[in-house]
Amino acid sequence: MATVKEKLMTPLTAGIKVPNNKISIVGVGQVGMASAISILGKGLCDELALVDVMEDRLKGEMMDLQHGSLFPHTHKIVADKDYAVTANSKIVVVTAGVRQQEGESRLNLVQRNVNVFKFIIPQIVKYSPNCTILVVSNPVDILTYVTWKLSGLPKHRVIGSGCNLDTARFRYLMSERLGIHPDSCHGWILGEHGDSSVAVWSGVNVAGVPLKELNPAMGTDKDSENWKEVHKQVVDSAYEVIKLKGYTNWAIGLSVANLCETILKDLYRVHSVSTLFKGMYGIENDVFLSLPSVLSAAGLTSVINPKLKDDEVAQLKKSAETLWNIQKDLQDL
């Protein structure tokens, strides 16, 4: 006896089994799920896969998203602890990792994350050898280096979310002072995603007008308007949000979706993301830091070479040295 489906439809051909724009997210914590909902909201993928070791949480998050399938334009939402579910991904977003314990050194934290990544990264590459990996887990610059080493992928296909969010925070805070939209404020945060990031005051402009020409002291201790405070707010913002609500997730989730959109739609937009820095600005170690970079469907296709002041270069070198002093002591890479 024919089923309702058989009575309803006459099949003409089999559907396409391989997704065109699949995104997988490793880790369904606060950041992973904020990334998922931001990606779904933009309608970026035809399949979204979630992976985590916490099976009940994973199934619950999958079901919760599936129940809203009427609203976004993503046809298929799947989840499993087995990485086979990520097969044929265009982008794999890594948000998984261990949290820092009270009194724990940064080196020890990174080493514990290395041990986690030693399982995760080979599984990603096994099932999606042609994917671009977007690392979001912190400390993101070092873990992007770890991912690059463990994956065997070319450097243009291993990208850290880096200072994309720092730059967004910077532009938002500038826009609040100037009373205009963040889109109309042009400025960049480079270097480490974190305390030693570098605000490139020499390049800050609105409508092509360099703000340094209007206020030569901008970004220095001599500035009566104290624009330097804007960068301090960028650095402190994550700590402040964590103090207030326990974690950050929405802004980084939106940042991840922004990066995925540029890659999947082959937009060739410029983002401040973490990439291999060796050979630039006199840095000779294998460190990943953020530079303005062109992203496309091929991954990170070009790096912009900003004209930096001597003090800005010195700050980048200091960032690189800080990261290398941790990386050089990592085991089993």
From Swiss-Prot:
Broad class of enzyme this protein falls into: oxidoreductase
Q: What reaction(s) does this enzyme catalyze?
A: (S)-lactate + NAD(+) = pyruvate + NADH + H(+)
One GO molecular-function entry: L-lactate dehydrogenase activity
User: Which terms under GO biological process does the entry name?
Assistant: lactate metabolic process
Q: In which pathway does it act?
A: Fermentation; pyruvate fermentation to lactate; (S)-lactate from pyruvate: step 1/1
What is the superkingdom listed in this entry's lineage? Answer: Eukaryota
Chain sites annotated for binding substrate: 106, 138, 169, 248
EC number(s) recorded for this UniProt protein: 1.1.1.27
Keyword annotations of the record: Cytoplasm, NAD, Oxidoreductase
Pfam families, sorted: Ldh_1_C, Ldh_1_N
Where in or outside the cell it occurs: the entry states: Cytoplasm
SUPFAM superfamilies from the UniProt entry: LDH C-terminal domain-like (SSF56327), NAD(P)-binding Rossmann-fold domains (SSF51735)
Q: Name one GO cellular component term.
A: cytoplasm
In its keyword annotation, does this UniProt entry include Iron? no
Active site per database record? 193
Keyword Transmembrane set for record: no
Which residues does the annotation say bind NAD(+)? 29-57, 99, 138
Q: What does this protein do?
A: Interconverts simultaneously and stereospecifically pyruvate and lactate with concomitant interconversion of NADH and NAD(+).
Query: What subunit structure does UniProt give?
Result: Homotetramer.
Similarity comment text for this entry: Belongs to the LDH/MDH superfamily. LDH family.
Q: Which PANTHER family match?
A: L-2-HYDROXYCARBOXYLATE DEHYDROGENASE (NAD(P)(+)), L-LACTATE DEHYDROGENASE B CHAIN
* Protein's name in the database: L-lactate dehydrogenase B chain
Encoding gene per record: LDHB
